[in-house]
Every structure is written in structure tokens, then in C-alpha cells.
């Protein structure tokens, strides 16, 4: 479909061009939900695996376990996406063609002997007899470690093999095991003395977007982990406003996202919040002023958790870029810090009233954009922290909120992990195992498992790859398998339990739950011209905007579709239709 201007009934409709297709698994947003290229809704339900952000520049615990074993079991256990924290320093090294070499401190890797060899007695010693762990991560001699960039490419390939999707999270400017405590995305030196600037941060992410633009295993980029700092720190703290100040996270994220999408318009852009925003408590309050004991000028939140600024200063990207935005707050429980909203006998409603709604939940509820809770998790204390985890888990399930649990690793002091320990034996190597036995925190996994995307009756885990099922043990499905064989029958736990028609409409055995309008001569939002406005129209919007050549939209359909008054048929129109379907606006307000 060529870009241009189409005139219908006196309305100039500018058709938005889309980039050439670079894979069939890229995702985009309409309202608060994510969809695939066919207009089918998807749900990202995954976990974090950190280590690339650290001095080892490699996901942790590959010093104890085989990567293939770990990822296979992660997939078999239903995790359909992994958030990989990384440092700007590591990305810059890769960009400059100077990746560090892996070391034994970060990974145990060997293939000994590297080839079959004569045992000296007329027999053969098979390759790998004396050592076969992470063998793809050493050179042909079976012992020299490869570099960190090649290692990540291998890890990404294994994710693809098992139907797992991934995205990178810039966790800190510098490679440091405690780098996350630094406030900003710029202003720290690399080991070689190079200062990580805002421009270098952007350049390294654009380089990564270019490198992986043809591999939809890597779905997108979390631009910066937990921008934070107290308001009274002024320019040393991340803020969210309409300025062009370097510490304005909203401005920096906009510049970075636009640059990434110029290279790969299909990538998802995950944008976290800040720590504090201005409260407006008193006239004349300003960012950087001293705090007050009462009537504070600042509203606090978790690091990266404060997205209040989106209401007044939403991220606005070039072209159709807003369709790639996913806002990504972090949320934790009292075992990390006993915040004021945990002081009472809290419930879902008190958490919404005291913190969640105005801080981030409104973005989902008001159909502004999708959410992905990039970090949540904690210790199983049998008390307040566990209660909070269960409440947040159920809220995410019931409100189609994407999430990545913190974390797989066992070595997160604040939270612990889903893994408990590992053992490896060369004697256990077979066609289905490289010898790793993985022990899980089964009680924590059981709590978390309910939030994984799965079918309602058979409990099949649903992957995000159209062709490759999630895992190999028969418990997982590809996206095509789910929509062909399960969506219209048993459905899934998305939205707390839904059955979907093959066109993506939510149904129950007795009735549809979509909102329909009375047929009119000019039916705003009715892009498919079936005489009503329903979720089916939103699906057609998705496919049209993505330049799906199998969908047909007539001139009258385009006239109906333009509801924002800007003469452009794009995701803004689809969002407005979703707001109408959710009863946030009337049909009269749907008209441009």
C-alpha cells in the first residue's frame, strides 16, 4: 500500500506508510492492549534474568548450569518472554566492535575433548566426554571463551529455539553489579574512561535496534531501568515534565524512542516512570526545592514506578510511533521497603486508592497505552509481602497487564528468585538434557504460575511465536495453535478468563461482551462497514495500520474510520474507538 492522500466525501485521508515486514511476530498497541500482526491480542507474561548488566556481562548462573537446559525449562514452565538487563557500557563495547571476552567467573564452558580422539588403545574418546557444558560458548579448541556479544546472540538463538521472546533493558550506564542504584541514564564513566552521555546511550540502543531489526525474537527495548532520585536533588534526579532539560526523562525517552523506531518501526518501546513528581501542593513549588515535612511538594513512588506525568505529559512519538509504546512501572512489596500504603490492612481497593491508580493503573484503565510491570516479586513470607504479591498478580490477570517477574536468579538480595539451586553432571547429558538439574522455589513459582498466559481448561502455556510452540514437553502452544484450536473453545486466563473468537472478539458461551452502536448512515468507527462498532473494527484498524494486504477497507470504511479530526487514519483513531467501546466516551463524542 503506497503512502498518499485519499479523498472521500470531501475528507482528505492521509494513509500512513508502514515499514516492510521483517518477521511475523512483531507486536503493536491499540489502547491498553497488545496485538500481533493479525489483530490477535497477546499477553507478555515473563521473568527477568540479570547479569548482562553486571561486570560479568553475562546472565548469571551460567557458571553453574547449561544455558540450553535453563532456557528449555523456562519455556516448559510457561514463561513466554525474558527481560534481559544490560548496561550501556556493554552495548557501547559491542557497537564499537570491542566486546569483552567471557571469563570463567561469568560462565562455566567447556567441550573436552573438542573432537573425537584416539584413546591410545585403539578406541575412541567421544567429543565432550570429559566436559560438555555451555559448549557453544567456547571456540573450536573447546576451552577458549567467545566474546560477550556472540554469547548473547547464542542465548537469543536458544530463546527462539524454545519459543521464548526477549527484550533488552538498559539497567545502568556502567557495567556494575550495583549499577541500578545510580539515578540517571548518563553521567557515569565506563572502565576505559569513556563518559556515557545521553547521545551515547541513544546511539548504542539505535545500534542494537539496527543489529536485531530482522530478528523478532528480540521484541523491543526497555530504554532505562528505574530512572529515579528525590525532587530536592534537582538536576541530579530524573524528572517528568515538558522541558528539554537533560534530566527530563520524558524528553530523553521521546528522543531515544524516535531514533530507535526510525531504524525498526516494529520494535516495542518500554518506558518506565520516575521516582517523584511534583504534587502541586502549593503555588510556586518547583523541581529541586527542599522537601517539606508536611504538604510535600513531591509525590513519591518506587524507583521507576511513578508514571503520573503521563496524564499531563504523555510521550508523543513521530508518525505512528505511539502504537509501539508500552509504559513499564515497577512495583514491589513491603519486604523491599515498607511504604505507607502497606501500613493498613491493605486490599486491592486500598492499593488502588492509595497508590496504584494515580501512579500507573489509570494508563491501563483509561485505555491510554498498555502496561508491563517490568519488575515485581519478593520473598514468600507467609504474611504481608506474600499478600501483596497475590493481590498484584490477580489485578494483572484481571486487567490484561503484561509483566516480567523479578527474577529467575537466586542472587537478588531484595527478592530472591524463582530458581533455588542447580547441579550439573556430565553423566546426565542426553538428547534432551545437557546435564543440568534445576531446582525451583516451588511455592514462589506456584504463586507466579497463575499469572502466566495459559488456556483455561487444559492449562497449556501460550507463546508469542506464531510457529514455534513454547517449550518442548507438550505443555506449550504457539500463537497460531492457540488461536486456531483453543481461543474459541476454552479460551485463556487473560482478563481473568476469556474465550476469543478467531477474529479476536471476546465472547462467552451465551453472548458477546463487545459494545455495539446503532447503525447509522455515517457510522464513525465502523471501518469494516458491518453496521455496528465493535472490537472487530479495532482488529481491522490494527491490520490496516500494519498494512496487512489481506484486509480490504473501502473508501466509505476509511471515512468512517477517521474519528480524531486530524485527517489521518492511524492508531489514535483505534484508541478513540476503544475508549467508546469501554464507555469512556459517548457515541456523540466518538465523532471527530
Roles of regions detected by a PLM:
Residues 1-3:
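N-terminal export leaders
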Residues 13-83, 94-122, 139, 485, ...:
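N-terminal carbohydrate-binding accessory modules
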Residues 59-177, 211, 248-265, 385-404:
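Aromatic-lined substrate-binding rim segments of carbohydrate-active enzymes
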Residues 353-504:
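Substrate-binding cleft of secreted/luminal carbohydrate-active enzymes
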Amino acid at each position: 500500500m503506497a503512502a498518499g492522500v485519499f479523498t472521500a466525501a470531501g475528507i482528505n485521508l492521509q494513509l500512513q506508510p508502514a515499514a516492510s515486514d521483517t518477521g511475523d511476530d512483531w507486536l503493536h498497541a491499540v489502547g491498553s492492549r497488545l496485538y500481533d500482526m493479525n489483530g490477535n491480542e497477546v499477553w507478555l507474561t515473563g521473568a527477568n534474568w540479570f547479569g548482562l548488566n553486571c561486570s560479568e556481562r553475562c546472565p548469571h548462573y551460567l557458571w553453574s548450569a547449561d544455558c540450553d537446559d535453563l532456557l528449555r525449562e523456562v519455556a516448559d514452565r510457561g514463561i513466554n518472554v525474558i527481560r534481559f538487563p544490560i548496561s550501556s557500557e556493554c552495548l557501547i563495547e559491542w557497537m564499537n566492535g570491542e566486546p569483552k571476552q567471557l571469563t570463567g567467573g561469568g560462565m562455566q564452558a567447556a567441550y573436552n575433548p573438542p573432537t573425537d580422539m584416539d584413546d591410545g588403545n585403539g578406541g575412541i574418546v567421544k567429543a565432550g566426554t570429559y566436559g560438555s557444558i555451555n559448549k557453544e560458548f567456547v571456540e573450536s579448541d573447546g576451552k577458549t571463551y567467545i566474546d560477550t556479544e556472540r554469547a548473547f546472540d547464542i542465548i537469543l538463538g536458544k530463546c527462539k529455539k524454545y519459543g521464548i521472546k526477549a527484550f533488552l533493558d538498559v539497567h545502568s550506564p556502567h557495567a556494575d553489579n550495583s549499577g541500578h542504584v545510580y539515578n540517571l541514564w548518563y553521567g557515569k564513566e565506563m572502565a576505559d574512561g569513556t563518559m556515557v552521555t545521553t547521545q551515547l546511550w541513544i546511539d548504542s540502543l539505535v545500534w542494537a535496534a539496527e543489529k536485531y531489526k530482522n530478528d523478532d525474537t528480540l521484541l523491543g527495548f526497555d530504554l532505562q531501568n528505574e530512572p529515579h532520585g528525590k525532587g530536592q536533588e534537582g538536576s541530579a534526579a530524573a524528572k517528568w515534565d515538558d522541558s528539554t532539560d537533560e534530566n527530563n526523562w520524558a524528553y530523553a525517552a521521546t528522543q531515544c524512542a524516535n531514533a530507535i523506531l526510525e531504524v525498526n518501526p516494529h520494535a516495542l518501546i518500554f518506558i518506565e516512570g520516575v521516582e517523584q513528581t511534583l504534587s502541586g501542593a502549593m503555588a510556586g513549588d518547583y523541581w529541586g526545592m527542599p522537601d517539606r515535612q508536611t504538604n510535600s511538594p513531591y509525590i513519591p513512588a518506587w524507583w521507576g514506578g511513578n508514571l503520573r506525568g503521563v496524564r499531563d505529559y504523555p510521550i508523543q512519538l513521530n508518525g505512528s510511533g505511539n502504537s509501539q509504546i508500552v509504559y513499564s512501572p515497577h512495583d514491589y512489596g513491603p519486604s523491599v521497603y515498607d511504604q505507607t500504603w502497606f501500613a493498613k490492612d491493605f486490599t486491592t481497593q486500598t492499593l488502588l486508592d492509595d497508590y496504584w491508580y494515580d501512579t500507573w493503573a489509570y494508563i491501563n484503565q483509561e485505555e491510554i497505552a498498555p502496561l508491563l510491570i517490568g519488575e515485581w516479586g519478593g520473598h514468600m513470607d507467609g504474611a504481608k509481602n506474600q499478600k501483596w504479591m497475590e493481590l498484584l498478580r490477580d489485578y494483572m490477570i484481571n486487567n490484561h497487564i503484561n509483566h516480567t517477574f523479578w527474577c529467575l536468579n537466586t542472587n537478588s538480595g531484595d527478592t530472591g528468585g524463582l530458581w533455588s539451586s542447580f547441579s550439573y553432571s556430565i553423566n546426565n547429558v542426553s538428547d534432551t538434557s545437557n546435564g543440568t538439574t534445576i531446582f525451583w522455589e516451588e511455592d514462589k513459582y506456584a504463586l507466579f504460575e497463575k499469572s502466566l498466559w495459559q488456556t483455561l481448561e487444559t492449562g497449556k502455556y501460550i507463546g508469542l511465536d506464531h510457529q514455534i510452540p513454547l517449550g518442548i514437553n507438550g505443555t506449550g502452544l504457539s500463537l497460531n495453535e492457540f488461536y486456531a484450536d483453543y481461543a474459541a473453545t476454552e479460551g485463556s486466563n487473560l482478563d481473568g478468563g476469556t474465550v476469543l473468537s478467531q477474529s479476536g472478539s471476546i465472547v462467552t458461551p451465551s453472548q458477546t461482551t463487545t459494545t455495539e452502536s446503532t447503525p447509522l448512515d455515517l457510522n464513525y468507527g465502523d471501518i469494516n462497514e458491518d453496521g455496528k462498532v465493535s472490537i472487530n473494527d479495532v482488529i481491522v484498524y490494527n491490520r490496516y495500520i500494519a498494512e496487512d494486504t489481506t484486509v480490504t477497507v473501502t473508501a466509505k470504511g476509511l471515512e468512517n474510520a477517521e474519528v480524531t479530526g486530524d485527517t489521518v487514519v492511524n492508531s489514535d483513531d483505534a484508541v478513540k474507538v476503544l475508549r467508546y467501546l469501554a464507555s469512556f466516551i459517548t457515541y456523540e463524542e466518538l465523532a471527530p
